[in-house]
C-alpha cells in the first residue's frame, strides 16, 4: 500500500503526473521491490539461484495475497470458492499452494498433484476431496480484457468529445 502523502510529496518535488503514473504502474510492485523484473517467472528463476531481492519480492507479494484474501474472507463471512486467475494465478502453482496452506483455517485444502496439473488453458479444480471450499484455476485472456477496457475508454472519450 502507499501513503497518499507520498504522492503529494512527489508533486511538490516537481514530478509531473506522467512521471508519477510511470512510477506507480511501471516501476512499483514486483519490479520495484526486486529491482529485477515484474515477471513472476523471472523472479522464481532468480530466487532459485539465490537472489535475495527476488525472494523478498516473491515473499512480499505472497504475503499481500494472503493478507488481502484473509481480509476479504472476514468481510464476506467465509468463502464458498476461491479462484486463481490472471498471469500469476493461472501459472504459479507454488503461489497457489502457499496461499491455500496459509488459509487452511478457512477449510481450504489444495490437492498438490491437481495443482501441478493445472495448465492455464482450461478451468481446473485443484481442491482436495476434503476441502470445504472449492479451489479453481481459471484462465484469463488478458489481451482480450485489455482490448475491451481500451475500447470502453475510447468510446467514453468519443462520447465526451461529441
Language model features: what each stretch is:
Residues 8, 53, 87:
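Conserved short-loop catalytic and cofactor-binding motifs
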Residues 5, 18-19, 38-41, 52, ...:
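Generic alpha-helical secondary structure signal
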Residues 22, 29-33, 40-75:
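Adenine-nucleotide phosphate-binding core of ATP-dependent small-molecule kinases
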Residues 1-45:
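Conserved ATP-utilizing enzyme core subdomain
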Residues 55-75, 79, 83, 89-160:
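Internal helix-turn-beta structural module
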Residues 2, 6, 25, 47, ...:
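Generic, low-specificity signal for short hydrophobic/alpha-helical stretches with a mild N-terminal bias
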Amino acid at each position: 500500500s502507499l501513503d497518499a502523502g507520498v504522492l503529494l510529496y512527489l508533486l511538490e518535488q516537481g514530478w509531473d503526473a506522467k512521471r508519477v503514473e510511470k512510477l506507480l504502474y511501471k516501476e512499483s510492485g514486483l519490479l520495484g521491490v526486486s529491482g529485477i523484473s515484474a515477471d513472476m517467472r523471472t523472479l522464481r528463476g532468480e530466487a532459485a539461484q539465490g537472489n535475495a531481492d527476488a525472494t523478498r519480492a516473491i515473499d512480499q507479494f505472497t504475503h499481500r495475497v494472503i493478507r488481502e484474501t484473509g481480509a476479504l474472507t472476514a468481510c464476506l463471512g467465509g468463502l464458498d470458492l476461491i479462484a486463481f486467475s490472471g498471469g500469476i494465478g493461472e501459472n504459479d502453482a507454488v503461489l497457489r499452494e502457499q496461499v491455500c496452506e496459509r488459509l487452511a483455517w478457512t477449510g481450504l485444502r489444495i490437492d498438490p498433484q491437481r495443482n501441478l496439473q493445472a495448465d492455464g488453458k482450461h478451468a481446473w479444480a485443484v481442491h482436495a476431496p476434503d476441502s470445504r471450499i472449492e479451489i479453481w484455476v481459471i484462465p484469463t485472456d488478458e489481451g482480450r480484457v485489455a482490448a475491451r477496457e481500451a475500447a470502453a475508454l475510447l468510446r467514453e472519450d468519443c462520447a465526451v468529445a461529441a
